[in-house]
Swiss-Prot record:
Protein name as catalogued: Putative pre-16S rRNA nuclease
CDD domains registered for this protein in UniProt: YqgF
Any one annotated GO CC term: cytosol
Biological role: Could be a nuclease involved in processing of the 5'-end of pre-16S rRNA.
Keywords: Cytoplasm, Hydrolase, Nuclease, Ribosome biogenesis
Family (UniProt): Belongs to the YqgF nuclease family.
PANTHER family per record: POLYNUCLEOTIDYL TRANSFERASE, RIBONUCLEASE H-LIKE SUPERFAMILY PROTEIN
GO BP term, example: rRNA 5'-end processing
Organism: Opitutus terrae (strain DSM 11246 / JCM 15787 / PB90-1)
HAMAP family registered for this protein in UniProt: Nuclease_YqgF
Gene Ontology molecular function terms on file: nuclease activity
Main location (coarse class): cytoplasm
Subcellular location: Cytoplasm
Length: 145
């Protein structure tokens, strides 16, 4: 299993990679200004890494409803299923991952870092790690004898 985590946005696409070892690692975000080039870079990354699973963040509202951003993620997932036939595409709840990722960066650096896509890739890492943790739960400790 080779997974690509995706935090899809209209300006940047955060990426992360993980496999059966169960550890998600951030990749450089796609920050091209042209959305078509950004999309092509996403497809190229998936092909180069020969991913078997794409894990797309699904930003549901706090009340579990799907707002405009969630519907956009659903459309992205559908497009990926079409353009990368044979690759499994999963939608994973990503509520608060961007907030959590941003919280790891000092307030004075957030504005500069945001444009680089670092926050987006950290969010993608959190999304993918959640998926991997569900697939490969950590082993239970052995009881002391």
């Amino acid at each position: 299993m080779r997974c690509l985590g995706i935090d899809y946005g209209t300006r940047r696409i955060g990426l992360a990679y993980g496999d059966e070892l169960g550890v998600a690692t951030p990749l450089p975000a796609l920050v091209e200004a042209d959305p078509a080039k950004r999309w092509q870079s996403l497809l190229a990354t998936a092909r180069q890494r020969r991913v078997t699973d794409l894990v797309v963040g699904h930003p549901l509202n706090m009340d579990d409803t799907a707002g405009p951003k969630a519907k956009e993620a659903e459309a992205v997932a559908a497009r990926l299923r079409t353009e990368l036939a044979g690759v499994d595409v999963h939608l994973v709840d990503e509520r608060l991952t961007s907030y959590e990722a941003e919280a790891t960066i000092s307030k004075t650096q957030r504005r500069a870092v945001r444009a680089s896509g670092v926050i987006d890739s950290r969010a993608a890492t959190l999304i993918l790690q959640d998926f991997l943790d569900q697939r490969f739960p950590p082993p239970l400790p052995h009881p002391a004898e």
